[in-house]
């Protein structure tokens, strides 16, 4: 990745709220499925803004800070997705998105950010990001990158 795009908490909340507005009326949704870990943050905002208390997770590992690796499904919410919003922070290459589409074919799949390779795989997103740009999300940052406590 040649460029970095740094996202602040304020930016992230603003974009997530914009996504929530596009998902109205809230009464059409049974719940939210957050793609762990990046989708947990927008899921919290969507849950609050739409008044949805039923939040599930699908745990798919594909990244280790700045490297994309093999896809592993660790946990999956048991539904075909009907009436659910599936949310992730980003769609990048589309590898995770393809797996999500197979798992939850009837869900509305949304992300905050989308890169060109993955954008056609989601139903909606807020911000376009160039394919060669790495996103530094606010939960990964202090004044610089902060490794998770478990890695120390």
Curated annotation (Swiss-Prot):
Chain residues that bind GMP: 92-96, 134-135
Secretion signal, residue range per the UniProt entry: none
Keyword Transferase carried by entry: yes
Residue positions binding Mg(2+): 89
Domain of life (superkingdom): Bacteria
Signal among keywords: no
Binding positions (5-phospho-alpha-D-ribose 1-diphosphate): 37-38, 88-96
Pathway(s) the chain acts in: Purine metabolism; GMP biosynthesis via salvage pathway; GMP from guanine: step 1/1; Purine metabolism; XMP biosynthesis via salvage pathway; XMP from xanthine: step 1/1
Protein localization: Cell inner membrane
Binding positions for guanine per the UniProt entry: 92, 135
Keyword line: Cell inner membrane, Cell membrane, Glycosyltransferase, Magnesium, Membrane, Metal-binding, Purine salvage, Transferase
InterPro entries linked: PRibTrfase_dom, PRTase-like, Xanthine_Guanine_PRibTrfase
PROSITE patterns: PUR_PYR_PR_TRANSFER
Bilayer topology: Peripheral membrane protein
Catalysed reactions listed for this entry: GMP + diphosphate = guanine + 5-phospho-alpha-D-ribose 1-diphosphate; XMP + diphosphate = xanthine + 5-phospho-alpha-D-ribose 1-diphosphate; IMP + diphosphate = hypoxanthine + 5-phospho-alpha-D-ribose 1-diphosphate
Task of the protein: Purine salvage pathway enzyme that catalyzes the transfer of the ribosyl-5-phosphate group from 5-phospho-alpha-D-ribose 1-diphosphate (PRPP) to the N9 position of the 6-oxopurines guanine and xanthine to form the corresponding ribonucleotides GMP (guanosine 5'-monophosphate) and XMP (xanthosine 5'-monophosphate), with the release of PPi. To a lesser extent, also acts on hypoxanthine.
Stated family: Belongs to the purine/pyrimidine phosphoribosyltransferase family. XGPT subfamily.
Subunit comment: Homotetramer.
Name of this chain's protein: Xanthine-guanine phosphoribosyltransferase
Encoding gene (name): gpt
